[in-house]
Amino acid sequence: MLKIVGFGSGAKDNMTLEAFAAISDARLIVGYKTYVNILKQYFPEKEYYSTDMMQEKERCQYAIDKAEEGLKVVLVCSGDSGIYGMAGLVYELAQKRVQIKVISGVTAASSGAAILGAPLSHDFAVISLSDCMTPWELIKKRVRAAADSDMVMCIYNPSSRRRAGYLKEACEIVSKIQSQDTICGYVKNIGRDNEKAEILTLKELAECDVDMFTTVYIGNSHTKVIDGRMVTPRGYKVI
């Protein structure tokens, strides 16, 4: 059996019990090199196989091959393995060659939201600004549709060296529909030693320095700051 495991933010306390048990039981851990390096501090006795960014197919195929040989293999992903993770690709590649079990993890949308307060208490859209797999024009269309619907947006992969201006452009799209004073927030390096969180306006967010390890939240027209926390009301009547 091949287990595809989402291990959360990387902090041991952020792993689900099921994810921790699956990794503990495995002989071989396969994953992106940054994630493998995180797990080595918790599971130093395991065998590891890692690849770089843009080598996802190779690492998934390796995990499938080793599971087919009878090894206890886990393919690890940060956050949840079914949300921008490797679960879908493994199903496409495996074609019933091995039994697959997907083990959910805490995705950045959830863990980052908890740090900021409660920004996702109503309908929201999760959108990645990475155009490696999705054309930028289609991503912008989705951002526009979410803003038109007055949904909170949780933005994954907001920036990189090659895509330095993408978040600013996304904010400009939203600002044509929503107020520039819309409450927003971001969390960098969730659950890690250099974690940083900030609540700010849409106008300020457009000029913000973010990276691939940042999760961004753009509020809706009802999102507000309560006691220093970003909160999107669900709609309950509060006396």
Predicted regions and their residues:
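A contiguous loop/helix-start segment that scaffolds small-molecule binding in enzyme catalytic cores
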Residues: 2-4, 72, 148-239
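Class I SAM-dependent methyltransferase SAM-binding "motif I" and its flanking Rossmann-like core
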Residues: 85-149
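A polyampholytic, Gly/Pro-enriched intrinsically disordered region
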Residues: 71-77, 119-131, 203-212
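Short, well-ordered secondary-structure micro-motifs
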Residues: 42, 86-87, 113-114, 137-138, ...
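Short gly/ser/thr-rich secondary-structure transition/capping motifs
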Residues: 7-14, 134-136, 198-200
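Class I S-adenosyl-L-methionine
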Residues: 1-103, 111, 206
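Fold-independent oxyanion-binding glycine-rich loops
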Residues: 7-9, 31-34, 51-53, 78-80, ...
